[in-house]
Amino acid sequence: MNLVLLSGGSGQRLWPLSNDIRSKQFIKIFHREDGELESMVQRVYRQIKAVDTDATVTIATSKSQVSAIHNQLGEEVGISVEPCRRDTFPAIALAAAYLKDVQGVGEEESVVVCPVDPYVENDYFEALKALGDRAAVSSANLVLMGIEPTYPSEKYGYIIPIGKEQVSKVSMFKEKPTQEVAKDYIAKGALWNGGVFAFKLGYVLNRAHELIDFVDYDDLFNKYDTLNKISFDYAVVEHESEIEVMRFAGTWKDLGTWNTLTEAMDSHAIGEALFNEKCENVHVVNELDVPILCMGLKDVVVSASPEGILVSDKEQSSYIKPFVNTLDHRVMFAEKSWGSFKVIDIDNASMTIKVTLNAGHRMNYHSHQHRDEVWTVIAGEGKTIVDGMEQNVKAGDVITMSAGCRHTIIAETELKLIEVQLGEAIDVHDKQKFELEY
């Protein structure tokens, strides 16, 4: 199975846990069988491999999410990196070119495209495999997944099939309707459009070449910022007459708001939280190092992270986006390919950050033009390289780097340090990377 997972969005509806770097698919809220927490993307990737160990998985995403993907899934997963956001058709076209020119997938092979963050069980991925198998032999150019609706939703588009068979031709598509119109659609056998497409790779590449002047993957990547923003539905689906839909009746949820997300949580608290006996239907997600105490609350979600604190009625939590848009969006926590960082304090001429490096990983070898840095190791062991000079470090060691100094740190065990940045103009873009043979 060749599977492309679309991973985008800034996830403002799940503030304060999500931001421009950490979208909802990277938030760790699900318990695995061993008790450890996993994110939506980790859960989905695990389920895919449980169904098809040989599945080729490519994640189409923006540059800002690459580090988080490597942190959570490892370095082996394929990533088609969008230089900028251009909606789903350019993203799928770039991923298709990546599959052909980088991964070596043949044009007659089938490809399935789906969102990275559905809340589903393994039968969903078994259905995706069947969808890809159907696309490989069908005379239709596109095979879509239609979700059997469980209620008349206003949040989804609808697919109207010609018949009621497991696989049938598509009669028409309908945009997100009112609840009353949705009831009428469902009575006529309509299915939710889950944003899942299957096709032969050559079909989408041919369509991409018709709409975009490019030679190969590298050429398309280099001119990506000149492409028009357009969805796959508008660019391809609406102009295709040979389309089939395959029904799916299993569990399928879009966890796009705090209300729907808490419905899928298997415990009322993640992180340190305490409830009195008067609390009813209350969920807490706490990423801070201090406890949250809830007394006499009903139908409430409480979420706390370095980005901020949300206390909301669950129904009202669906409407937080315009309020979040008014807030300062400085990133206070992020996962990197080598570990993670959390901003502890910001002052006029300094910033203090807690950094965690995973064992066997290191930062880029880099320098800053406008700031000095001081590292204080608080746990673990490793090695620093400062202007080519190596030094073993452990808890209690302090390393000072002046502006212009090239430096990195390598973690031999999990390593934690406090980084203090000092300067009048502290800027995330003040960073120059260098090659390091190590």
Roles of regions detected by a PLM:
Residues 6, 114, 377, 420:
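Catalytic metal- and UDP-sugar-binding loop of GT-A-like glycosyltransferases, i.e.
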Residues 11-16, 23, 428:
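Short N-terminal binding/cap micro-motifs at the start of the first secondary-structure element
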Residues 121-216, 223-224, 244:
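Conserved core of the sugar-phosphate nucleotidyltransferase
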Residues 41, 95, 117, 159, ...:
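Residue-level signal for inorganic ion chemistry
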Residues 1-5, 15-20, 30-113, 119-126:
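Conserved N-terminal catalytic core of the sugar/cofactor nucleotidyltransferase
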Residues 201-400, 405-411, 425-426, 431-437:
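Left-handed beta-helix
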Residues 418-426:
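C-terminal structural segments of small proteins and small subunits
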